[in-house]
């Protein structure tokens, strides 16, 4: 049997039977980016997480109190110095969870990212900040030299959607600044930051004028030596109160980026490569500290999923706050050849191996243009997971990282695969009659029935068959339908090498995607691509 026609089972053999010993040692402060919810009431068109309110609150799209408790334990046990509570969605949709984080965090610096839609009402803004401050005091952070930073996103789209009519469009931001200026002027551990985008300098200048501020070079940069920002400065008010303004690049994010649009694709790849290989030193799973030590760099998602190595995870290994602590997270992360190979050798190593059999996978992982999606997109196909794992094992064997008795203890099938030449593996991979569609048929409930509707539509061009299928299967969630819609969109945009669809069927996919979008989902976007476990 060709293992690449049953890649999930063969990859599982590796996960179950091969346990590696890492060389890398994390001896310094770590970094965690935590997404509290996928939901956001603002709905900016440029949102790199495509956040909206199409789905009601549930345990898949929003953290629970117990998950936040587990997150705080992870922050402590992983020696995390820097905690970024980010989008995803708008964390302050769940203010009690944010106050819980403020009180319980043990990180040296904790940023709370917000669009600040809640600041349109100044009374409400004052109440939210006061509750944050009370939580800050309960946490005794001043006694430990820790900082809490409210980081407000400021750009034209946020302002357009949040500003109240008949008011200065920046009034809600001005109100926040005045609250910090008048009520917390001497709190150097409880601070405000404004975060904007390159190209929005005029808007930030307008804000500076609105608060009668003066722009200064940064002299107490909160981000320096932690995470790279494109540029920054400080605004000083007449009262002497100061806050930092940082800028980042606008990403060309798209969950179904069109690989056929070569001009835009080139820009997207350049943006990704700059961030990955200059800003993150080619290894985003490692947090490099100024004292020369290294720490872990993790991503934690609202449904509890944890990437123990940021942009380096293998999507088929479940790691979750609901059942994993720091020790088990790192054990699962560093014993998996697919993850350890990336963490120890960097992103370029992984890209080069996958390029041997599927250049499209490399392109699409960069073209999505959101770093949190790079591993799930790159390694979406089970065939690629298996190929990469085998090639990493071959390199570990060549480097004498695996003892003879360990190798002999592996299943014979794995020994056979790792003993093949690269050309033999490539030949097996490319000859396998298995693609992303077959993968969905095997792994997604009722997709096989939907796939038959796709084939029927390609022959008859009658939308009713699609509609009737979903009417007769009401238990298929809208989240699942949206995931299938996204798959079709990606097929249209040239993401995959396909063997289960003929040319006529591929041509009909765009029409079927439109039917799902307009007639089944009514334009709602629910599946966000990160909560896949």
Which role does the model predict for each range below?
Residues 18-50, 81-85, 300, 304:
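N-terminal pre-triad scaffold of radical SAM enzymes
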Residues 46, 50-53, 318, 325:
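Secreted/processed peptides and extracellular or luminal domains of membrane proteins
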Residues 148-291, 301:
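Classical nucleotidyltransferase
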Residues 165-169, 195, 205-208, 236, ...:
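Class I S-adenosyl-L-methionine
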Residues 227-381, 388-389:
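Accessory C-terminal segments flanking Radical SAM cores
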Residues 353-531:
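Extended non-globular C-terminal regions
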């Amino acid at each position: 049997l060709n293992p690449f026609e049953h890649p999930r089972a063969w990859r599982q053999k590796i996960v179950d039977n091969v346990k590696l010993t890492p060389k890398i040692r994390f001896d310094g402060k770590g970094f965690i980016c935590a997404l509290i919810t996928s939901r956001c009431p603002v709905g900016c068109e440029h949102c790199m997480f495509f956040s909206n309110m199409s789905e009601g609150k549930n345990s898949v799209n929003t953290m629970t109190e117990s998950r936040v408790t587990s997150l705080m334990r992870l922050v402590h046990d992983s020696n995390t110095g820097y905690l970024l509570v980010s989008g995803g969605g708008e964390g302050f949709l769940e203010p009690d969870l944010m106050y819980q984080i403020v009180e319980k965090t043990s990180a040296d610096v904790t940023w709370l990212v917000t669009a600040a839609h809640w600041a349109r009402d100044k009374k409400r803004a004052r109440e939210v900040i006061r509750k944050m401050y009370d939580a800050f005091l309960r946490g005794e952070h001043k006694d430990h030299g820790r900082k809490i930073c409210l980081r407000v996103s400021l750009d034209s789209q946020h302002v357009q959607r949040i500003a109240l009519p008949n008011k200065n469009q920046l009034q809600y931001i001005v109100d926040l600044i005045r609250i910090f200026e008048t009520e917390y002027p001497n709190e150097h551990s409880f601070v405000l930051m404004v975060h904007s985008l390159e190209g929005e300098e005029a808007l930030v200048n307008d804000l500076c004028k609105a608060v009668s501020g003066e722009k200064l070079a940064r002299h107490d940069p909160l981000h320096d030596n932690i995470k790279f920002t494109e540029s920054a400065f400080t605004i000083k008010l007449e009262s002497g109160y100061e806050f930092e303004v940082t800028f980042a690049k606008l990403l060309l994010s798209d969950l179904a980026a069109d690989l056929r649009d070569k001009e835009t694709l080139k820009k997207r790849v350049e943006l990704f490569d700059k961030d990955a290989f200059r800003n993150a030193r080619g290894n985003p799973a490692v947090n490099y500290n100024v004292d020369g030590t290294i720490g872990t760099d993790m991503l934690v998602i609202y449904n509890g999923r944890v990437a123990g190595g940021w942009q380096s995870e293998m999507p088929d290994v479940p790691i979750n706050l609901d059942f994993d602590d720091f020790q088990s997270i790192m054990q699962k992360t560093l014993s998996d050849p697919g993850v350890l190979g990336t963490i120890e050798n960097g992103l370029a190593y992984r890209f080069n191996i996958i390029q041997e059999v599927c250049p499209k996978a490399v392109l699409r992982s960069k073209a999505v243009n959101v770093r949190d999606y790079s591993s799930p997109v790159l390694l979406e196909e089970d065939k690629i997971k298996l190929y990469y794992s085998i090639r990493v094992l071959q390199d570990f064997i060549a480097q004498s990282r695996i003892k003879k008795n360990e190798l002999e203890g592996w299943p014979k099938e794995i020994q056979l695969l790792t003993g093949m030449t690269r050309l033999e593996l490539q030949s097996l991979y490319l000859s396998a009659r298995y693609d992303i569609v077959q993968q969905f048929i095997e792994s997604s409930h009722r997709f096989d029935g939907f796939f038959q509707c796709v084939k029927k539509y390609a022959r008859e061009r009658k939308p009713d068959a699609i509609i009737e299928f979903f009417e007769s299967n009401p238990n298929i969630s809208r989240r699942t339908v949206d995931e299938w819609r996204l798959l079709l969109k990606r097929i249209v945009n040239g993401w995959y090498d396909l063997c289960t669809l003929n040319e006529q069927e591929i041509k009909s996919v765009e029409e079927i995607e439109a039917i799902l979008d307009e007639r089944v989902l009514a334009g709602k976007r629910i599946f966000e691509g990160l909560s896949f476990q």
